[in-house]
């Protein structure tokens, strides 16, 4: 029985007691049970940064609510937890704190595990792992060597950000205004050998698979479709001439708009293209530009925002139809890693080419017009002013200035050109994808070692499986200049597995997306000798995956791809890793600041600010508690370290209790929307928890309740019982189908309020109240499990795991009403209400509605033309 003092809600004591019971009974450990339907629910695993933030709390509470609800509805539920433990932040922390990344990471895991446990999540901790341990990453090393042998992993040069001072590769986020974040050195673009996985071999399957993911948000599927970027077009060959007219290797370009081919006035190539390097040998000015472009961005997003720059190479390309020679230009918006590194430039019908041509005075030719212009602007074409219709393929177009192709529409031109080029061997139809192969090499220390050995005689050799894992040394001194494994000859130097000669290990490590691409499957069989075992096919695919929409493309794309690799390796049977995806919104909070001496802003944590609000709760002013002086109000933004507007979950748990924090995080907004943190709202949830606690103890203190006898209930007792079962029905739907936890909580609060007004101390009155209180405790259990655990005992039901108690079912007979209240409208305007028997006839309802005193007053002098009855809701009298 609960030892908590009646009428005093002590969250810490309640929560400690419940958690001790769950731990002692291993309440949430599961195995494969064919007698129950399985439900595999998880959140995206956290990076062990050192402390939970409110985004974590919201994410994991959503998963926990669904998991606990599913247990109560008879499912065999797996909810695991682990740690995405490799990555750049550990290296940065190691530099700052002068400690090894491993030591920092493992200490953070210990701390964050304790934080998670304090929130009472129903996690099977027996399946916990950290992705930085050899027991975990040995399996992805083994998989990689198998992919190498199948040709799905390969090595080629790729462009990276290079810091010449620190002698290291930088992630895009480590480049600030073109300089290294730590050294301040001007960052260069450098080509280095890197390993790739052929995700492009799966592009069409990844695209088609989205049509089967009915449980994924449309927004995520749209982002993935756009990222895969399937397009149908022609690959066309342009012969190339050197400055002296000598032939060079031809260019092949891909275009989805072959109808604009006669508008090509130049060809653009990437700065790293072999033809650009060839031309630069005899052109110092061009060579200088190529050197400058080394310092530019390496991503499509960066290139889109950069000022467009370029230079003529002196080379020319031969137009494949007209035979005219057009100049070849280097352009900084062409990526060597995208397509062929060359594009045919049609400035008349491509905005990027249009801007470039206008900047450098290149010809611009119109070769397409609208067949049915909508206005005068669409009838005119201006080579100095861009209009969107110039490139609108969705409109009906007609070719002009295109020789024998004049008058054709897009489809006709596509077919005519495709037939011509295929017949002459100058081109072919092609399906192209925006998706690029996945570069998995990272020039960092704190990651999974890539299991490859380099031999002067044998080349790149996969590490034999009996020599795996290649273990990353953890006890290192990390300065941030270079990688400890690069500078450690005892680790780096080895022998070739094929010839036995001297060789060296690969010193790059895997992209950390590798670890997070298969961990969901590993939870199903965490002690398996291979990557997974037969248990994976019991649990996979996961039934619900909860995480932020910011992971819609990279993580979730690689996640789907890697699962298909595992399927093709016969490790899993399913095509997709997750059936349903829930993308929760951000946690946001108010921001406050003072102007800094350097012109910036000093951001102040909301906990250090006293806020003034108007009667509607809006912030009208704020002062710093320390000095009483005003601070600026910066608006509401995502909680972040940079804006210093985060709220420490541990401080909230210490102040209010885990259940109250969980309750607020589920009540403040629907899961998919942003949640604004508001401590006044947390106070409100704390008051509700105390009120519920008192309601239960007050009821129990008045003595035991007799058995409920529905045959003798009064009208008021029936009304409360009906409210109870209406609430059960709504909350069941909100939990199970809609994931609308805020409305579920609101419904329970309404029932609590109705019960507070129910002043009936009779035996059956108390029986009705007992049923309602038991229902409330069970309905709230997925969200407030500690308090529910205690209150269930107070209600005389004993100490048990509530997840094994069946979720309440609405009694259909309790929902039947003896009488109904209907709104009475006159010509659509509310004029009164009437109470009618549930089985009243239409004639009786019409008579009562017209006799309602206020309605009768408005009907004076009017004739009733029609009476519309919406059953159970409205009577609308149409009169004139």
Curated annotation (Swiss-Prot):
Catalytic activity entry: tRNA(Leu) + L-leucine + ATP = L-leucyl-tRNA(Leu) + AMP + diphosphate
Gene3D superfamilies: 2.20.28.290, 3.10.20.590, HUPs, Isoleucyl-tRNA Synthetase, Domain 1, Valyl/Leucyl/Isoleucyl-tRNA synthetase, editing domain
Listed EC numbers: 6.1.1.4
One GO MF term: leucine-tRNA ligase activity
Binding site for ATP: 641
Span(s) of short sequence motif 'KMSKS' region: 638-642
A GO cellular component entry from the record: cytosol
Motif ('HIGH' region): 46-56
Domain of life assignment: Bacteria
Stated family: Belongs to the class-I aminoacyl-tRNA synthetase family.
Protein name (database record): Leucine--tRNA ligase
Gene: leuS
């Amino acid at each position: 029985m609960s030892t908590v003092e009646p009428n005093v809600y002590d969250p810490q004591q309640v929560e400690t007691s419940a958690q001790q019971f769950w731990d002692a009974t291993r309440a949430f450990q599961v195995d494969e049970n064919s007698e129950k339907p399985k439900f595999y629910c998880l959140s995206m695993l956290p990076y062990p940064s050192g402390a939970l933030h409110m985004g974590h709390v919201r994410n994991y509470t959503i998963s926990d609510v669904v998991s606990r609800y599913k247990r109560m509805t008879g499912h065999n539920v797996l909810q695991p937890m682990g740690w995405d433990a490799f990555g750049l932040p550990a290296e940065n922390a190691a530099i700052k704190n002068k400690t090894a990344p491993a030591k920092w990471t493992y200490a953070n895991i210990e701390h964050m595990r304790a934080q998670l446990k304090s929130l009472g999540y129903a996690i099977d901790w027996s399946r916990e792992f950290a992705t930085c341990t050899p027991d975990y990453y040995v399996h992805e090393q083994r998989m990689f060597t198998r992919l190498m042998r199948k040709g799905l992993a390969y090595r080629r040069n790729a462009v990276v950000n290079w810091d010449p001072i620190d002698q290291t590769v930088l992630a895009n986020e480590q480049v600030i205004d073109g300089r290294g974040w730590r050294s301040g050195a001007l960052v260069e673009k450098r080509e280095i050998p890197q390993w790739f996985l052929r995700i492009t071999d799966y592009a069409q399957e990844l695209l088609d698979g989205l049509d089967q993911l009915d449980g994924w948000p449309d927004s995520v599927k749209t982002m993935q479709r756009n990222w895969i970027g399937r397009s149908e077009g022609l690959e066309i060959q342009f012969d190339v001439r050197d400055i002296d007219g000598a032939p060079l290797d031809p260019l092949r370009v891909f275009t989805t708009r072959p109808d604009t081919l006669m508008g090509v006035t130049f060809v653009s190539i990437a700065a790293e293209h072999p033809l650009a390097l060839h031309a630069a040998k005899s052109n110092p000015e061009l060579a200088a530009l190529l050197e400058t472009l080394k310092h530019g961005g390496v991503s499509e997003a960066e290139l889109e925002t950069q000022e467009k720059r370029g230079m003529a190479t002196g080379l020319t390309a031969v137009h494949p139809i007209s035979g005219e020679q057009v100049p070849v230009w280097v352009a900084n918006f062409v990526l060597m890693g995208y397509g062929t590194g060359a594009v045919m430039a049609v400035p008349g019908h491509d905005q990027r080419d249009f801007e470039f041509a206008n900047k450098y005075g290149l010809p611009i030719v119109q070769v397409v017009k609208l067949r049915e212009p909508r206005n005068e602007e669409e009838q005119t074409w201006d080579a100095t002013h861009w209009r969107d219709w110039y490139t609108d393929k969705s409109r009906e177009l007609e070719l002009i200035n295109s020789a024998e192709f004049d008058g054709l529409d897009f489809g006709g031109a596509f077919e005519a050109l495709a037939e011509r080029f295929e017949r002459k061997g100058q081109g072919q139809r092609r399906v192209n994808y925006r998706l690029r192969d996945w570069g998995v090499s990272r020039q960092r220390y704190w990651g999974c070692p890539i299991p490859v050995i380099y031999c002067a005689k044998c080349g790149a050799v996969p590490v034999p499986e009996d020599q795996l894992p290649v273990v990353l040394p953890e006890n290192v001194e990390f300065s941030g200049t270079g990688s400890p494994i690069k500078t450690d000859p005892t680790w780096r130097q080895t022998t070739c597995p094929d010839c036995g000669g001297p060789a060296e290990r690969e010193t790059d490590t895997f992209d950390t997306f590798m670890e997070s691409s298969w961990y969901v499957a590993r939870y199903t069989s965490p002690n398996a000798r291979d990557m997974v075992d037969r248990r994976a096919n019991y649990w996979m695919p996961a039934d619900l995956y909860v995480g932020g929409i910011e992971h819609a493309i990279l993580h979730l794309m690689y996640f789907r791809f890697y699962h298909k690799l595992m399927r093709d390796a016969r490790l899993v049977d399913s095509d997709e890793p997750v059936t349903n995806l829930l993308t929760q919104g951000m946690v946001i909070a108010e921001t406050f600041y003072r102007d800094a001496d350097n012109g910036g802003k000093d951001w102040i944590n909301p906990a250090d600010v006293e806020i003034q609000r108007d009667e509607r709760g809006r912030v009208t002013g704020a002062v710093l508690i320390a000095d009483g002086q005003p601070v600026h109000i910066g608006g509401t933004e995502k909680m972040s370290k940079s804006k210093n507007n985060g709220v420490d979950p541990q401080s909230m748990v210490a102040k209010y209790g885990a259940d109250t924090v969980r309750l607020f995080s589920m009540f403040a907004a629907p899961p998919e929307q942003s949640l604004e943190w508001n401590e006044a709202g947390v106070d409100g949830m704390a008051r509700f928890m105390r009120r519920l606690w008192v309601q239960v103890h007050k009821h129990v203190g008045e003595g035991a309740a007799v058995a409920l006898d529905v045959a003798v209930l009064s009208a008021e007792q029936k009304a409360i019982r009906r409210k109870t079962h209406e609430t059960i029905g709504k909350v069941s739907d909100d939990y199970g189908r809609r994931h609308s936890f805020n409305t579920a909580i609101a419904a329970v609060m309404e029932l609590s309020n109705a019960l507070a007004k129910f002043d009936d101390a009779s035996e059956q009155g108390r029986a009705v109240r007992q049923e309602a209180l038991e229902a409330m405790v069970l309905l709230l259990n997925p969200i407030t499990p500690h308090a529910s655990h205690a209150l269930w005992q107070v209600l005389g039901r004993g100490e048990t795991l509530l997840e094994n108690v069946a979720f309440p079912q609405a009694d259909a007979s309790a929902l039947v009403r003896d009488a109904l209240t209907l709104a009475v409208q006159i010509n659509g305007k509310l004029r009164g209400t009437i109470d009618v028997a549930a089985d009243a006839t239409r004639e009786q309802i019409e008579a009562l509605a017209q006799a309602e005193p206020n309605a009768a007053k408005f009907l004076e002098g009017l004739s009733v033309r029609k009476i519309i009855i919406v059953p159970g809701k409205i009577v609308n009298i149409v009169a004139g």
